[in-house]
Swiss-Prot record:
PANTHER family in the cross-refs: PROTEIN S100-A9, S100 CALCIUM-BINDING PROTEIN
One GO-annotated biological process of the protein: antimicrobial humoral immune response mediated by antimicrobial peptide
Composition bias type Gly residues, residue spans: 108-119
Region (Disordered), start-end ranges: 94-156
Keyword Cytoplasm attributed: yes
Gene from which this protein is expressed: S100A9
GO MF annotation terms: antioxidant activity; calcium ion binding; calcium-dependent protein binding
One Pfam family matching this protein: S_100
Free-text tissue specificity from the UniProt record: Found essentially in phagocytic cells.
Basic residues: compositionally biased ranges: 135-156
Source organism of this protein record: Bos taurus
Identification of the protein by name: Protein S100-A9
GO cellular component labels: cytoplasm; cytoskeleton; extracellular region; plasma membrane
Binding partners and assembly: Homodimer. Preferentially exists as a heterodimer or heterotetramer with S100A8 known as calprotectin (S100A8/A9). S100A9 interacts with ATP2A2. S100A9 interacts with AGER, and with the heterodimeric complex formed by TLR4 and LY96 in the presence of calcium and/or zinc ions. S100A9 binds quinoline-3-carboxamides in the presence of calcium and/or zinc ions. S100A9 interacts with amyloid-beta protein 40. Calprotectin (S100A8/9) interacts with CEACAM3 and tubulin filaments in a calcium-dependent manner.
Length: 156
């Protein structure tokens, strides 16, 4: 019997499943082409990418930036960089919107969730929310414990 997944594990699985909901539609089943990426951004990230959501040129620019091997499609590894950047930007936004007070507090992020305190101390970075280039070219292999493509709610 498997242990119940933690909230973070469930969230990671949700990201993978949503990627696959869009990646299987057109082209290669495990990559996002431009049309699939645009649909994913518009439907799944409406609050995080409000400005870019309705601007096709901005969506195309984000995709080009993420497409590190310049094959006009996004692998999961390329796509997850967007998730990481949005997570960092939302965390910074939570610090910027936190009510003044002692300790390490969080206000609403771009998704309007999160409030309260967390266990860390210190002041937040006052960096920008630019989703531009950060650390391209760092590939990895699944090494036998990545996700499989059989039996997880998508067919090939």
């Amino acid at each position: 019997m498997e242990d119940k997944m933690s909230q973070m594990e469930s969230s990671i699985e949700t990201i993978i499943n949503i990627f696959h909901q869009y990646s299987v539609r057109l082209g290669h089943y495990d990559t996002l082409i431009q049309k699939e990426f645009k649909q994913l951004v518009q439907k799944e990230l409406p609050n995080f990418l409000k400005k870019q959501k309705k601007n096709e040129a901005a969506i195309n620019e984000i995709m080009e930036d993420l497409d590190t091997n310049v094959d006009k499609q996004l692998s999961f590894e390329e796509f997850i960089m967007l998730v990481a950047r949005l997570t960092v930007a939302s965390h910074e936004e939570m610090h910027n919107t936190a009510p003044p007070g002692q300790g390490h507090r969080h206000g609403p992020g771009y998704g309007k969730g999160g409030s309260g305190s967390c266990s860390g101390q210190g002041s937040p970075d006052q960096g920008s929310h630019d989703l531009g280039s950060h650390g391209h070219g760092h590939g990895h292999s699944h090494g036998g414990h990545g996700h499989s493509h059989g039996g997880h709610g998508h067919s090939h």
